Amino acid sequence: MTEAGFHLKHHLTSFQIMILGFAGVILLGALVLMLPIATASHTWTPFHEALFTSTSAVCVTGLVVQDTGSYWSGFGQTVILLLIQIGGLGVITAAVMFLMLSGKNISLKERSAMQDAISAPVVGGIVRLTRFILKGTFFVELVGALALLPAFCRDYGLRGVWMAIFHSVSAFCNAGFDILGRAGALYPSLTAYISDPLVNIVIMLLIIVGGIGFLTWDDVCTHRLHLRRYRMQSKVILSATAILIALSALLFFLTDFAELPAGQRVLASLFQAVTPRTAGYNTADLTKMSDTSQAVTILLMMTGGAPGSTAGGMKVTTLAVLAANAVAAFRRREDPQLFKRRLEPSAVRNAAAILLLYLGLTFAGAAVISAAEGLPLGACLYETASAAGTVGLTLGLTPQLGTLSQSILILLMFFGRVGGLTLIYAAFSGHDLTYARYPKEMITVG
């Protein structure tokens, strides 16, 4: 190793390594997707379109500028699936996996990076947890693919095997990519399966399992039904996930899908409640949903899943911390609480910072796109919320946007996957963060 390489390796923080890792994989994926072998027509793909697709795959978003099923060849779809898998696991986790397979020891620096990548509380036991994550991921994806086989093989014959594998991995990684499109029926997502209980239920379960986080899996597998032994964070994630799904499903049932039979209406409402929190699949025509439902969908997209999961967004824990802080303010309590545990002041500060970052970037991006494209702000906000939340739901605008607007979505997808605080910590690493403690003074708010 050169002196410069040694210096770089040992002076980069785990946050900087994470960001450079994601950026490197995205760039490599874009270069491969440009090749004629990656497209069904065997033509070169413009760099910007390849970069958008690679970013969407690695950031497990699902927004596309070309229909995945009809534009990309089998090789191109395989590359996209590999990028989705790396993005879902996380670049650091994938790198640690290759180190394990090669028999190399995992250094303390690599363990620390892994800790940050999956939001683990301590470095100890990180290798065991990584093995658990890898085994759990491939097991769940295999079971999901086997469960989807009957439906896809019924409709597509032997090609259904590949489709079952692709959609199982994409759903578990909360990516939302589909390969069901064909000439004359582009960007279909799962609309053909709105009345298929098997496909709906399997996809929903894969999305939920992928979106609750690896540490939550560890609690569930270790303590099973002994809920009191769960980490407070796992309790918050499971409770918030259940509440968000139940409330949004009820709202969608009351405001949409009136044309469907009762059973299908319940199924469609549930699916639409699960998928906005970073999965990106849809069984219904999103453009026909009510304004209320579209507004709620935007909020769900920004909320996202759990920390240390395949999901993006602000995270349900951020929402829970802000809600607990609001309750403490209403009750004039000094400390916000969740499940009989006081929250650290740093958690409240971080939650407020994340909220401001997501709101600011999402609305700013929507405003720029609206001005550049001459489109309604609300429709643009739907696309930017989908990008920042790494969701992939769209009202059909993304493929029609210009290069500037699509570049904004690329940046938002990257921001949504690596996380706002990760970007800030990486940017300010190495700076002297000591500060003077000034006198306190009250300020009136509200």
For each predicted feature, which ranges?
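Membrane-proximal intracellular helices of multi-pass ion channels
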Residues: 1-446
